[in-house]
Amino acid sequence: MSASRRKESVAMIRLGICNELFENWDFRQVCRTVRALGYDGLEIAPFTLAPRITDLTLGRLRELRSIAEDAPLSVIGLHWLLAKTEGFYLTTPDASVRRKTGDYLLALAEATRILGGELMVLGSPKQRDLLPGVTQEQAGDYAAEVFTRIMPEIGRMGIDLCLEPLAPSETNYLNTCAQANRLIARVNHPNLKLHMDVKAQSSETEATVPELITRYAPAAGHFHAQDVNLRGPGMGDVDFGPILKALVASGYDRWVSVEVFDFSPGAEETARQSIACLRRALDAAVR
C-alpha cells in the first residue's frame, strides 16, 4: 500500500472504548470523560444499561443517544450481547430457544439503531458452547439457521452483526477467524461480518496477530484492542506497532475499540494509556 493510501486508512480509523470499564459511572459522565480523553466513540455492553435491552423504553434509548451526541461522541454499537442474560442460546437443539435468541438479537439490533450505532459484536461464549451431544457440525447448522432468519431484518436496519472468534479457554465453538468466516460464508449476508480481537486472535496457533490481520481484516467489520494480560493497549507486553501497521496496510477503515477485562488500574488511567498507545502506533504506521 502506498504512503498516501496508508494515510487515508489511518484517517478513517476511529478510536472508541467499551463502556463496562466505567463501572457504576453515570452515563453522561462516561461520555464526557471518554470524549475529553480523545476518543470518538463509545461501545456499549447492554447489561450496563439494564438486565435486558428490552427493559429500556424508547424514550430512555433516545435519551442515551442524546447524551452521547452532546459529548459529542458516537455510539459505535453493542457488544457482550447475551452476557448476564438467561434463556438464550445460539447452538441449542431446542428450536424454541433458538428462535427466542434470534428474536432477542433483533431487539438488540433495533436498540442499536435507535442509539445511533452501526454494529453489534456477538461473542457471548457461554451462550454458544457445545451442549452435551451436540457436534460442531450440528452447532453450525443451528447457528446458521438463526442468522439466516434474522440477518435480512438486521440488514434493513443498517446494522452489521460481527461474529467474534474466541479462545478455546473461553468456548469450544468458533475459535478461529477461519471458522467464523466459514459460517459467515454459509449464511451469505453482507451485514454478517467477522470481528477481530487482539486477545482472541493471540490464541490462534497457525499465524501471528499481524498475519491474521493481513489475511482477514480487509473484510472485517470491527476490531477490539487490548493486551493479553486483560488490560489496555500499552499496559502489557503486546507490541501494538506491528498490529496497527498490519491493520492500516490491510485497508481497514472502521472502528478500533479498546476492550479490557482487568479494571484494576482504574477507568481513566486505562483509557488514557490505551489511546496514547494506539495513537503512537497509528502515527508510526504511516511513516
PLM segments and residue spans:
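Residue-level detector of anion-binding/catalytic polar loops
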Residues: 40-41, 74, 118, 160, ...
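Histidine-acidic metal/acid-base catalytic patches
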Residues: 2-38, 65, 69, 116, ...
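Short hydrophobic interaction/assembly module
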Residues: 61-83, 87
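Glycine-rich, proline-tolerant flexible connector loops at the mouths of alpha/beta enzymes
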Residues: 45-65, 124, 131
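Residue-level preference for long, well-ordered alpha-helices that form the structural scaffold
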Residues: 53, 57-60, 94-101, 135-139, ...
